């Protein structure tokens, strides 16, 4: 498909992150049926500071290179007149503007803020002798959140390593994972297109039996996108309608006596 904007056309392909700066008039023209995960940020999406030197150049240990970031390719001429509807997002709502000219009708542009794409397959995976924690796969950062990419990679290579995530609690962040493609070895009941949300403070980790099953594995074939936020996430009505109540019980063996509790906010907590 192609995001069109005042900066020109910017084709994307499967696996692309498409970053569109705030204040950019744009529209997305997809080609066929597609599945997207969309993050809306109140500020800039940036390359993590630890990947850059004091001048902003990517360091040699960074998991990608500046040539992996792609700018718009073609600035087309738009001369058509008539009503053109532009939806402007203002905080928690929208305003509608009707222009008598095409919103992308520009002669040219100059500067350093423009849409760009980065493909998840260009992310060089992070590996180690023992298990690397999820934040080591950080790809971007934004105000009060980070984006991480899980890609096919060699697993932990210490002879006594258990090559699967350990049980943990995120005390200061909410963990949302979008499962893009491949085989997800630490989860049961997950398929391509699934989204999981683990709230802060709730212990989670591999499903029963998967740690033992992982022993001897040398590589993983998965693509997933994780968003860790440092403020609590709220479920929308649509998200609640799509919730799979069986997921929270998937850590329990039969007969463990797990129960569900409805809290005053109307969100089901599984105990």
Short names for language-model regions:
Residues 1-271:
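Jelly-roll (double-stranded beta-helix
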């Amino acid at each position: 498909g192609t995001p069109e904007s005042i900066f020109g056309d910017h084709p994307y392909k499967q696996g692309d992150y498409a970053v569109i700066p705030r204040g950019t008039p744009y529209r997305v023209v997809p080609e066929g049926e597609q599945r997207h995960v969309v993050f809306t940020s109140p500020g800039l999406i940036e390359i993590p500071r630890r990947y850059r030197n004091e001048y902003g150049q990517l360091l040699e240990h960074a998991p990608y290179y500046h040539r992996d970031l792609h700018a718009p390719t073609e600035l087309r001429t738009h001369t058509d007149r008539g009503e053109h509807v532009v939806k402007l997002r203002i905080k928690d709502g929208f305003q509608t503007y009707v222009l008598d000219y095409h919103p992308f009708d520009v002669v040219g542009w100059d500067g350093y803020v423009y849409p760009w794409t980065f493909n998840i397959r260009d992310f060089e995976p992070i590996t180690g002798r023992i298990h690397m924690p999820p934040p080591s796969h950080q790809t971007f950062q934004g105000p009060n959140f980070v984006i991480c990419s899980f890609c096919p990679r060699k697993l932990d290579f210490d002879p006594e390593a258990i090559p699967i995530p350990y049980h943990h609690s995120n005390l200061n962040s909410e963990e949302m994972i979008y499962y893009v493609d491949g085989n997800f070895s630490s989860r049961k009941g997950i398929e391509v297109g699934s989204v999981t949300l683990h709230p802060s403070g709730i212990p989670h980790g591999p499903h029963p039996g998967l740690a033992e099953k992982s022993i001897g594995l040398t590589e993983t074939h998965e693509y997933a996108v994780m968003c860790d936020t440092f403020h609590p996430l709220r479920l929308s009505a649509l998200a609640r309608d799509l919730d799979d109540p069986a997921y929270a019980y998937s850590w329990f063996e039969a007969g463990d006596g797990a129960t569900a509790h409805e809290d005053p906010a109307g969100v089901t907590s599984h105990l």
